[in-house]
Amino acid sequence: MDNMKDHPLYRKHDIDSAMNALWAFYKGRFVALFLISLVISGILQYATMLIDFKSLYTVTDPALVLEKLKSYMVPMLIFMVAGLLSNTIMHYYILHKPIDSSMNIFISIVKSLKYFIPYLILMVLFACFAVLAIVLGVFVLFIGAIFAALYVGMLSFFILPVMMAEEANIQQTISRTIKLAHSGFWANMGWSSIFFVLYLIISIVLSGVVLLPFAGSFMKTFANPQDTSSIMHLPNDPLFLFLSSAINALTLPLSPIFGFIIYFNGKAKEESSSISFTGNDNGEQKVRVEDLYAKPREENNFDQPPAQG
């Protein structure tokens, strides 16, 4: 992308500016991001209803349970692929909308498709690496497993930003992801850890809000543990479906935004360290200011009205 530096998230960050940029970008474009995420979450939430997990609770034979789980493999794979596709679309929209006024969600859906197959292949490879890293981490006790999980999570933030912003192929994406993630490694690990903790807290609180209208059903179950019918049918309740989709829509854009923040931070630091010299009329060498910092733009003011999506 030639105009990558025009993106409002492109700059060198510290932890304070990174979190402020995350909140400002999210707040400034909340309506568009929420509506897009609501549609995506609604589709994914409805897809989970098609997988009849509650029938597992009526089966006591382990062999039958395994047979049931095998029958769920294809629907679960379709669900995972749909989740990766929605993630690809969201990343493309967040990258291009702030610097291209003609961009909308429908264009994003079409143009993001060219990244989906390479991303799908990368995620299969990445999943194998993640399992290996976490298993190896287990041998270094519980702390090792946590560190490995955080490391894998940190790497995942760079994959789509690198692929989309640099038009990289699979091999280039792997190479650039490793390079940018390990440039400022401890800062990236620290920021990712803070993000994961905040994301977890927000998700738990919002999930509690979703369950408030159904507190009566839980109270009945606590009073009579043998009667779980009200809880079992909860995922099929239209109100629960809508509230769950709305809550997921609130948190869905956070990960892509944060991914672009740490990517652009690494990219800006990388470019500022690669100082280019140009000759003047007297043959002398001078450093250009624009080689050190991204050009300041009015668009970097996050308090402006959100772009229409």
What are these regions (language model features)?
Residues D2-Y10, A21, H91-M103, V152-I170, ...:
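Juxtamembrane transition segments at transmembrane-helix termini in multipass membrane proteins
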Residues W23-L38, F116-I121, H182-S193:
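Membrane-interface helix starts
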Residues Y57, T88-K114:
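Hydrophobic transmembrane alpha-helix segments characteristic of membrane transport
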Residues P8-G28, N104-L113, I170-S183:
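A short amphipathic helical element positioned immediately N-terminal to and/or at the very start
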Residues V110-A130:
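A conserved helix-loop-strand patch within extracytoplasmic ligand-binding domains
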Residues A32-D52, V81-A82, F126-F129, G190-S207:
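Hydrophobic alpha-helical transmembrane segments of multi-pass membrane transport/permease proteins
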Residues L33-L35, M73-L77, L120-V124, M189-G190, ...:
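Hydrophobic alpha-helical transmembrane segments
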Residues L44-M80, A130-L150, S203-L252:
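Membrane-helix interface segments in multi-pass membrane proteins
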